[in-house]
């Protein structure tokens, strides 16, 4: 059995790490490089960096910090934000990232997934999906431009359908960002993850809702995800990654130590 991954997520805005609640009201957490170093030292398996306003601003990730991060950590990391072309992706990978993640640009141009997978290999290509449960319709809907409160909008895609579509086009991994749970810290949406897992045949990473160690145990025991991504519990030092791994190992969950 493959070890379950613990993945801190760093939302980047104007060169600093920020964190919001349900994708709104972002506060500054700190500088990118020291945080990346801290998480690598604590035992994170991987890091994910989202330049959260790149897509809505119509620009690509600022690459200067990508190279600085690559210099100071020795674990894999993934970078997302406004990657619209193979050239954009190539530059980020050249600067030292191990994977690139696309979200809004994939919705605007689904062919991009195939192009990147063909050029760099599926193992490098992650698709982020921002999924919102609409209580009125009872459906999970994919949202776009979620880094900008004024531009964020529902797309025509239901979550399950988009998960199937991106796999057909060459996504090597899917990060499911569950918007209703984001930053609220009351647990992952296990029902949604199980629904997505039924149609997801590539590694699936849960994102949104971690508040205490038991939430990680629950998501691994009850949904068969490959990894769990979290932000505020790590940024605010509510949970230490080393201690989390000890706890999960005691719960008979396979983790890298």
UniProtKB/Swiss-Prot annotation:
Keywords: Amino-acid biosynthesis, Cytoplasm, Histidine biosynthesis, Lyase. Pfam families: His_biosynth. Heterodimer of HisH and HisF. GO terms for cellular component: cytoplasm. The gene is hisF. It comes from Aliivibrio salmonicida (strain LFI1238) (Vibrio salmonicida (strain LFI1238)). The keyword Cytoplasm applies. One of its GO terms (molecular function) is imidazoleglycerol-phosphate synthase activity. Belongs to the HisA/HisF family. It is an enzyme of class 4 (lyase). The keyword Lyase applies. This is Imidazole glycerol phosphate synthase subunit HisF. It is found in: Cytoplasm. IGPS catalyzes the conversion of PRFAR and glutamine to IGP, AICAR and glutamate. The HisF subunit catalyzes the cyclization activity that produces IGP and AICAR from PRFAR using the ammonia provided by the HisH subunit. Its EC number is 4.3.2.10. One of its GO terms (biological process) is L-histidine biosynthetic process. Its main location: cytoplasm. It catalyses: 5-[(5-phospho-1-deoxy-D-ribulos-1-ylimino)methylamino]-1-(5-phospho-beta-D-ribosyl)imidazole-4-carboxamide + L-glutamine = D-erythro-1-(imidazol-4-yl)glycerol 3-phosphate + 5-amino-1-(5-phospho-beta-D-ribosyl)imidazole-4-carboxamide + L-glutamate + H(+). NCBIfam families: hisF.
